Amino acid sequence: RCRVHLYRLCRVAEAEGILLVMESLRDDESNLVYDLPRAREMYRQIGHPNLKMMVDNIATGAAGETLEDWFNAFGDDLIHMHFLDGDPWLHNVWGDGNTSLSRQLQIMQAHHFTGYLVQEVADEHYFTDPFSADRRNFRVLERFLED
């Protein structure tokens, strides 16, 4: 049923001139698409040019996968990313987890990634002072930005 509805949504997206992006979740969040093999199979079965992929590096870490695995699977159809520092379960600001920011950026550069990066800082320990968390996050990211 999910595939049928996703395909229908893709046809509407095509008529509207937009793309849909599918995200893989963790296995405690979904029973449909929670790892690379299931994402690849759903993507293949939908088979519509208006369906693209996104990667959440928290979900990939929890599944024991890498960003490289996802680029190898989807190539240029990987256009969006929840880009966080995981442990791998928490949605941390950069510097609070154990994900290598420099390695993630190297992989994106090697694959000429020009898609969107979203900071989905959603762990509850940031809720009391989100401004401070954002400030710390951007200070870490600034070290990797070019003028």
Predicted feature locations:
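Generic enzyme active-site microenvironment
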Residues: V21-M22, M54-N57, V118
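Histidine-acidic metal/acid-base catalytic patches
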Residues: V33-K52, G61-D147
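Active-site acidic/histidine proton-transfer and metal-coordination neighborhood
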Residues: R1-K52, A62
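Short, contiguous strand/loop micro-motifs
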Residues: R26-E29, N57, L90-N92
